[in-house]
Amino acid sequence: MNHKQLRLETPPLVEREYFTDPQHAVDRLRGLYDQAANFLTQHFLRALGGEAPQARYRAFYPEVRLTTTSHVKADSRLAFGHVTLPGTYAATITRPDLFANYLREQFALLMRNHGVSIGVGVSDTPMPVHFAVATRTDLNVPQEGVLDFSLRDVFDVPDLNTVNDDIVNGVAVPAPDGTQQLAPFTAQRVDYSLARLSHYTATAAEHFQNFVLFTNYQFYVDEFEAFARAALANPALGYSAFVAPGNQIIDSPDGEILPLPKMPQMPSYHLKREGSQGITLVNIGVGPSNAKTATDHIAVLRPHAWLMVGHCAGLRNSQSLGDFVLAHAYLREDNVLNDDLPVWVPVPPLAEVQVALEEAVAEITQLQGYELKRIMRTGTVATIDNRNWELRDQSGPIHRLSLSRAIALDMESATIAANGFRFRVPYGTLLCVSDKPLHGELKLPGMATDFYRTQVSNHLLIGVRAMEKLRDMPLSRIHSRKLRSFHETAFM
């Protein structure tokens, strides 16, 4: 069959509708998305069943659109929920079921701040069949050559022209008709990350919570599970379930979690709360590449904050093993984000996050004021991409570390903070000193065991408590203007 001659078949075309009720706009988005995804899924199933394709099947993502003609400025205190100039703004939307709360909130802000209606219709961006069937656990898109026809001749596949970070990186240009971006990510970019999250973490995107902890050791996972089970035993805390890799869900403190035959690269664990207001812990392993990968994909979920709670090398003789390090600046030698965010761009500390972390340390350790300085130091954290940096000539690295006033060194924190800055996700870092390589205290098995046994529990609890403090803040305070550039998307 010559698939180039196949006719094009699409779902029935529909007119754009305008809404002044956020919920009605979300409902319409869900209807359009389901229509497109079901259309592609049905034809894909027929093709898998051996039915020869009789057309090229194409469906489109839904989109939202608004137009404002007024130069009246929105409240200058707002970090999101408004556009800066008159014009037409649009965004393609995927998985409106997953993002329903987020979309309702963004629509309500735009309607209130600009007095406009939200248009919902069909975009001109094709939906790849891979993403249309992504929620079907019983379906897999076969590799090219497995079917007796070329998949790309019959269905649309992911397009790198729309799977990129141009919007958040500030290099996206308006559409030919002048329409500007309304959201930080395109629908295809979001779908790509949702698929990657499932692959890397072995949990579905709908389980991720708005407050994310990153760690680099299994010890923290064990403590998080213990905390989660205790939390489920106390309904007053408001947590409803705990999800482990493999989408294993328990809602009672004694629920069984089975070990997976094969663990994912970055296993994630989710202590759920109504409205996704719980806490997710991701064990990203070691290295800036993993840190970038995890944050690249979690960012599309638009979390309210993410924190790194891991271990570091203490660089000062006055530090002791087990001391905490609160990062207020970063020396970026991770070399994974240089093309997206040059190293000359400062990554500032965020006051709301810093205060939440410091208060959490004080609560858990029962130390206040000047006494708190005995076990916690605030300063610059250096992140490098060479775990065995100690084996090279020390003069260069040590000089740079001294010039930067660094007090700790690791392989993930600056990457996570820099990507938080890039993606407008509030970020922070609280590390625990596990070794002092410049002072002869290396990370050795026996030393590590004693150290982890006494320190990990407190460190994890501090991270959880800080997240609970951030959760209690208004969104307008957490998502501050510090992370916004000259021309920002209206969506958070």
How should each PLM-predicted stretch be described?
Residues 1-305, 313-492:
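Accessory terminal and edge-of-domain segments that mediate assembly/interaction
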